[in-house]
C-alpha cells in the first residue's frame, strides 16, 4: 500500500484547510452513506481512502457540493 502524503493531496486542493474539509466530507460519504470508493479499498479506513482519492485527482470540492444537492 502506498503512503498518501499531504503534499500529494495539495497538488489537487488549494490549501490544507480545504483538504481537511474535503477529506472529512468524502470519508463520511463512504462510511455513513454507502458511497462506493473510486480507488481500490485495500482494507483502509474511510479517511485514508478519501485522501487516496483526492491525491489521485478523482474527488474535488465541486463534485462533493454537487452531490449534496
From Swiss-Prot:
GO cellular component: DNA-directed RNA polymerase complex
Catalytic activity, as annotated: RNA(n) + a ribonucleoside 5'-triphosphate = RNA(n+1) + diphosphate
Pfam families in UniProt: RNA_pol_Rpb6
Highest taxon of source: Bacteria
GO biological process: DNA-templated transcription
Molecular function per GO: DNA binding; DNA-directed RNA polymerase activity
SMART domains with a match to the protein in the record: RNA_pol_Rpb6 (SM01409)
Keyword field contains Transferase: yes
Keywords, ordered alphabetically: DNA-directed RNA polymerase, Nucleotidyltransferase, Transcription, Transferase
SUPFAM superfamilies tied to this protein: RPB6/omega subunit-like (SSF63562)
Enzyme Commission designation: 2.7.7.6
Function: Promotes RNA polymerase assembly. Latches the N- and C-terminal regions of the beta' subunit thereby facilitating its interaction with the beta and alpha subunits.
Oligomer status and interactors: The RNAP catalytic core consists of 2 alpha, 1 beta, 1 beta' and 1 omega subunit. When a sigma factor is associated with the core the holoenzyme is formed, which can initiate transcription.
Family, per entry: Belongs to the RNA polymerase subunit omega family.
Name this polypeptide is given: DNA-directed RNA polymerase subunit omega
Amino acid at each position: 500500500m502506498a503512503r498518501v502524503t499531504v503534499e500529494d493531496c495539495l497538488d489537487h486542493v488549494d490549501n490544507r484547510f480545504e483538504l481537511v474539509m474535503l477529506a472529512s466530507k468524502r470519508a463520511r460519504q463512504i462510511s455513513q452513506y454507502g458511497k462506493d470508493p473510486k480507488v481500490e479499498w485495500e482494507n483502509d479506513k474511510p479517511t485514508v481512502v478519501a485522501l487516496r482519492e483526492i491525491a489521485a485527482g478523482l474527488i474535488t470540492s465541486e463534485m462533493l457540493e454537487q452531490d449534496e444537492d
